[in-house]
């Protein structure tokens, strides 16, 4: 079969137009290859993905790497298929890029199978509707916004409130406890963080059960817009072909939208609200609908979602909200109090915070904790203007308990040991429920509030109080 080749007619940044012979246009999403000497010495080293048919036998493509060094008239090869990701157990412990090439300098992947990165979501009849909670070992999450196995979880937060640290702690806790395979997609984040994560995983022994797919901040928008799909293809293989329960971590889903917006502008589409692409909801839907549980296996995804200027109504985070089963909202106000993880206990939600799923006792205590914290929030204006003395005895008690709860929601992390100097804590769900139940019932009203800060279980808080009293 003769190979279908075209030639470059124009290059504008990450967008390359290619002309083919009449009747030989490659399909949308097909991968084309061209040699770019500026990247390295190998042949056909640059992948272009067909995005539009322009008419007059031309296609407009998005480059997956640098286009510096391309010339007009250069020959372009149509591969006749989409970008494909290597799948299977050979990808575990490796770092690959958007086009499935290893970037960890450890030789070829050696996989037997590869899957296209654009696929249909599983049909309704194949999807599973079973709902069960799974424990993360992080108190504030397990108590107030529990995660569902096979669900989609979003970690929302502005710059520097701890999304990546929380996602690294979840990888550490869940991958250790869960013991299954994980896939991590680094979408448009810092290269340094990617390196830190790799080192961290190597040290904790989680690496051999994880496939890492990276497309960092310095990559062209085409790579950042597609790297999440490459990771998803790997996770889908474990779910569909091997019948496993997989964890998919994406850091950061906002960068997927941001890259889509850059690509959209380069393709000449008219922007919609706040300058985002007109296809924002469609692109997000195509990605999110593939992350689901089937009768074969499940994909549980944890996605960090950057919130521009701390505005949750921005179209990018607002579009992601609609797809999620649980949201963990990180708050700058809580981070300023020095309470980490800086999860907002009143803003975070979960679809499975339901007595029929998590049990009556857990549900009742979670609601009591939220009631006390909400009441404290309502009283804060009065305290700020008139002071604590003007409150009734009942309100003073609520404030004291709320401050203890607030501090008890903090917890030392394993991945932050190097910064905090205190060893990380994994708290079992029963211990979390017991601890908050005792605070809410007033059993520890006599203890100082600082005893509850940065501890694991309630027993540790009592122990810390005894130490403070002895000083």
UniProtKB/Swiss-Prot annotation:
Coiled coil: none annotated. It catalyses: ATP + H2O + 4 H(+)(in) = ADP + phosphate + 5 H(+)(out). PANTHER family: ATP SYNTHASE, ATP SYNTHASE SUBUNIT BETA, MITOCHONDRIAL. ATP binds at residues 157-164. PROSITE patterns: ATPASE_ALPHA_BETA. Pfam families: ATP-synt_ab, ATP-synt_ab_N, ATP-synt_VA_C. One of its GO terms (molecular function) is ATP hydrolysis activity. The gene is atpD2. Its EC number is 7.1.2.2. Its main location: membrane. Keywords: ATP synthesis, ATP-binding, Cell inner membrane, Cell membrane, CF(1), Hydrogen ion transport, Ion transport, Membrane, Nucleotide-binding, Translocase, Transport. NCBIfam families: atpD (TIGR01039). Belongs to the ATPase alpha/beta chains family. The keyword Transport applies. It comes from Pelobacter propionicus (strain DSM 2379 / NBRC 103807 / OttBd1). This is ATP synthase subunit beta 2. It is found in: Cell inner membrane. It is a peripheral membrane protein. GO terms for cellular component: plasma membrane; proton-transporting ATP synthase complex. The keyword Transmembrane does not apply. Produces ATP from ADP in the presence of a proton gradient across the membrane. The catalytic sites are hosted primarily by the beta subunits. F-type ATPases have 2 components, CF(1) - the catalytic core - and CF(0) - the membrane proton channel. CF(1) has five subunits: alpha(3), beta(3), gamma(1), delta(1), epsilon(1). CF(0) has three main subunits: a(1), b(2) and c(9-12). The alpha and beta chains form an alternating ring which encloses part of the gamma chain. CF(1) is attached to CF(0) by a central stalk formed by the gamma and epsilon chains, while a peripheral stalk is formed by the delta and b chains. It comes from the Bacteria.
């Amino acid at each position: 079969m003769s190979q279908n080749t075209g030639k470059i007619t124009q290059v504008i940044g990450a967008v390359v137009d290619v002309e083919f012979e009449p009747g030989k246009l490659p399909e949308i999403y097909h991968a084309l290859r061209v040699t770019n000497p500026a990247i390295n010495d190998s042949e056909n080293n640059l992948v272009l993905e067909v995005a539009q048919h322009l008419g007059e036998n031309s296609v407009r493509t998005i480059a997956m790497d640098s286009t510096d060094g391309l010339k007009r008239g250069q020959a372009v090869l149509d591969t006749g298929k989409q970008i494909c990701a290597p799948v299977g157990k050979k990808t575990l412990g490796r770092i690959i890029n958007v086009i499935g090439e290893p970037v960890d300098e450890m030789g070829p992947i050696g996989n037997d199978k590869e899957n296209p990165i654009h696929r249909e979501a599983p049909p309704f009849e194949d999807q599973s509707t079973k709902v069960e909670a799974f424990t993360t070992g992080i108190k504030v999450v397990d108590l107030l916004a529990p995660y569902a196995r096979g669900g989609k979880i979003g970690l929302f937060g502005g710059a520097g409130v701890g999304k990546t640290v929380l996602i690294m702690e979840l990888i550490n806790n869940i991958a250790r406890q869960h013991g299954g395979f994980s896939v991590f997609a680094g979408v448009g984040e810092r290269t340094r963080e990617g390196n830190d994560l790799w080192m961290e995983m190597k040290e904790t022994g989680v690496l051999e059960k994880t496939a890492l797919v990276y497309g960092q901040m310095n990559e062209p928008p085409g790579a950042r817009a597609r790297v999440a799909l490459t990771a998803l293809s790997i996770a889908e293989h474990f779910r569909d072909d091997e019948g496993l329960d997989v964890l998919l971590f994406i850091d950061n889903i906002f960068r997927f939208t941001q890259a889509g917006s850059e690509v959209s502008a380069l393709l000449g589409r008219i922007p919609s609200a706040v300058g985002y692409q007109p296809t924002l909801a469609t692109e997000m839907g195509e990605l999110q609908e593939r992350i689901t549980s089937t009768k074969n296996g499940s994909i549980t995804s944890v996605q960090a979602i950057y919130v521009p200027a701390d505005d949750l109504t921005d179209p990018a985070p607002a579009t992601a909200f609609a797809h999620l089963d649980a949201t963990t909202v990180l708050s700058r106000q809580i981070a300023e109090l020095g309470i980490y993880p800086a999860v907002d206990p009143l803003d975070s939600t979960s679809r499975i915070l339901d007595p029929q799923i998590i049990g009556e006792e857990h549900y009742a205590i979670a609601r009591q904790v939220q009631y006390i914290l909400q009441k404290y929030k309502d009283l804060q204006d009065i305290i700020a203007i008139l002071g604590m003395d003007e409150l009734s005895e009942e309100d003073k008690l609520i404030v004291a308990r709320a401050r203890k709860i607030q501090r008890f929601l903090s917890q030392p992390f394993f991945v932050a040991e190097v910064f905090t100097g205190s060893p990380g804590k994994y708290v079992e769900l029963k211990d979390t429920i017991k601890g908050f139940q005792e605070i809410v019932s007033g059993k520890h009203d006599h203890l100082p509030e600082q005893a509850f800060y940065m501890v694991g279980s309630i027993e540790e808080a009592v122990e810390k109080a005894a130490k403070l009293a002895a000083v």
